[in-house]
């Protein structure tokens, strides 16, 4: 599922959201296809790849196809964990990694697996009362109230602001939120409890999170406009 409340179930459908959303591009997918069809280069590629002129069908499929190539997997953490390059992480970063995956913090319970997400919907106690009701809007299930999709942490050092509403400007604020155990909320995940981290431990965690930055992926010229 895509989007923070999980309201979109395919990449092809997800393409429509930023394109047509009023607060983003505010454009019509049909009109977008028609405009691109006037550009000879795009029309040639469309005929070659999809055997049809550029239109809304091609726009959604082509963009989704490109998005499926955006796979990040060569960060310092990947080099250390998957490629057995012990020198890829510093002692500080290794301490942070061990803390991240420990039963003390439970970070890895939600942010595990290759993409550092369990793909579930959780309430992390960001607020005692949320303005946005999250997944509840779609399901009307009380157990889904104020729950949002657990995001991937890959390249998280570059994706501020954080939380579903962008209310935290840096990783220090995020770590402190989890350190105090979030706010009291009926649907808050039972995994989120006070961590009682000291200053050095917070710095270790943040150092580890920065090891998830894949500079090779970020600087890939083929992925730039």
Where are these regions (language model features)?
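Periplasmic c-type cytochrome electron-transfer domains
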Residues: 1-225
